[in-house]
Amino acid sequence: MMNEALKKLEELLDKDQFEKIKAINNPYLHSFLAEWIQWLEPSKVYVCTDSEEDEEYVRWKALYYGEERMLEMVRHTVHYDNYYDQARDKQNTKLLVPKGTNLPFLNTMDREDGLREIREIMKGIMRGKELFIGFFVLGPKNSVFTIPAVQLTDSAYVMHSEFLLYRKGYEEFKRLGPTKNFLKFVHSAGELDERKTSKNLDKRRIYIDLVDETVYSANTQYGGNVIGLKKLAFRLTIQRAVREGWLSEHMFLMRVNGPNGRKTYFTGAYPSMCGKTSTAMIPWENIVGDDLVFIKNLDGVARAVNVEIGVFGIIEGINQKDDPIIWQVLHSPVEIIFSNVLVKDGKPYWNGMGIEIPDEGENHSGKWWRGKRDAEGKEIPPSHKNARFTVRLEAFPNLDREALENPCGVEVGGMIFGGRDPDTWPPVRESFNWDHGVITMGAALESETTAATLGKEGVRAFNPMSILDFLSVHIGDYLRNYLEFGRKLKKTPKIFAVNYFLRENGQWLNEKLDKAVWLKWMELRVHNDVGAIETPIGYIPRYEDLKVLFRQVLNKDYSREDYEKQFKIRVPELLAKIDRIWKIYEPIDNIPEELFQELEKERKRILEAREKYGDYISPFALEK
């Protein structure tokens, strides 16, 4: 017998589209779709299966509706967002929680109020528009990591982006049958202006219902606000991971190639502008993913998968010299959506690309010319600093394809936390153990704000595990889950911290590619192939080992003087950091006691070393 929701869907959909939904035996899905199709009132509905025809239909519709335009290179298109819709809207992104829920640092709203408001905004918002329904999975299909998700959107650009970024999941939904275990995303770009960008930005809302695992976004097109399975799903999967005892992390996943063909996998969490992409893209190593991972305990071993199969990357500053692989991908005839870049004669241009940029063209502000100013009198650059490219990982020659598709994931040899400061953390170090690494490296992560982030330059932004913007649970619960996850493993990944941004007298102490050496050292440490120097803050490399690696990896000399400058233990700065981190956590209830214990032990070790060696300690003094 057909359930009520299915009957309703039969009325609402064309026969072909209805048959696609009917083939999925899931009454929970049927009632969700029936409710929202009625509420949104689209004039047409298209259901995407896993077929190439459906993907082609979406590509065509993105062009037909004017949300994307073709560029000169085959398979390349450009999309523009509203001039004032160019980044994640933190103010209007809210977690909907039951009354009385307290989540420090997070932007929350009473669930009943939030649902009432978003429903009001979205009532009939798709009149005269086409609704696309897409099915996807996070993580590999048919695996212990798989999380199914359904996306409703009136933007062909959003659906096109998700086809590039995620594994298709229609067949997976059919296989799973009547499960409630799927994530739900409802998006409308709202009314569009003549450039086909969202018009009613005053009604822009991104509401994340943590109870029903559903995200609603309205009157916005910027990827971070609307690509449901990206950072919106991330908040839902963090909550799920903490509840179920695994990790959902804002990390790259890469393979570092060791001696004799050995493959070692690392995850890495770095706040923006801290070197995450450039680390994951070192030409002679291999990428598995650049942004989001799931890590689970399988038979006592931490194993990780890339949640995605594509890259939604910042294009600013990508140039041939520093980013040869990405540059090559962006100039090859693979399917790419460029967003908010300058276009002239069908070619895309962006800030910092290292070649001459035309003096006029079209960009996110419309018709553009050099010196053009916006309504606030600010000069408009050729491309927006948050301009993006969306492309499948299979386009990258350095992709580790086997690791990307392995349903069991890959063993995590090491986890890297990458901060940014001019004077505190050494370039690379290893923690004493899991708890020490989680607390003094991950939970204490800071990045000095740069010109590229809003706010004052030179301020240290606290960003534990680089996850603060996306956290959806109490930070104490999140950290407790992290600590417990490691304790349950038979084989614990090593934890490392890196900092590529040390300065002395205004000069950088490291060159851009030095990070390639730190990776090789970490790979050797995972397998205990080299020794290390014990310091109050963890293990650092020995000069002799780095000297060999600099010659092997970069074919250059590495002086004792450089080593000493980079790896000296900076006592006053390290103590100041412990005080800063302590003060942030101290007023918050429900923080694991281990956090304060680890910080106190670290402080004690640093003070003891100061007694013996003074404020600035040469690594040679500590070498036993």
Curated annotation (Swiss-Prot):
Thylakoid listed as a keyword: no
| Co-factor binding comment | Binds 1 Mn(2+) ion per subunit.
Q: Name one GO molecular function term.
A: GTP binding
**Amino-acid positions noted as binding GTP in the UniProt annotation, renumbered to this chain:** M273, C274, G275, K276, T277, S278, R388, R420
Sorted alphabetically, which CDD domains does this protein's record hold?
Answer: PEPCK_GTP (cd00819)
**Catalysed reactions listed for this entry:** oxaloacetate + GTP = phosphoenolpyruvate + GDP + CO2
**A GO cellular-component term linked to this record:** cytosol
PROSITE patterns reported for this sequence: PEPCK_GTP
Which residues hold Mn(2+)? K231, H250, D291
Where, per UniProt, does this protein localize? Cytoplasm
- Keywords on record: Cytoplasm, Decarboxylase, Gluconeogenesis, GTP-binding, Lyase, Manganese, Metal-binding, Nucleotide-binding
Q: What is its EC number?
A: 4.1.1.32
The active site is formed by C274
Q: Which InterPro entries match?
A: PEP_carboxykin_GTP_CS, PEP_carboxykinase_C, PEP_carboxykinase_GTP, PEP_carboxykinase_GTP_C, PEP_carboxykinase_GTP_N, PEP_carboxykinase_N
Q: Which family does it belong to?
A: Belongs to the phosphoenolpyruvate carboxykinase [GTP] family.
Q: Know the name of this protein?
A: Phosphoenolpyruvate carboxykinase [GTP]
Q: What does the organism's lineage look like at the top?
A: Archaea, Methanobacteriati, Methanobacteriota, Thermococci, Thermococcales
- The gene name on file is pckG
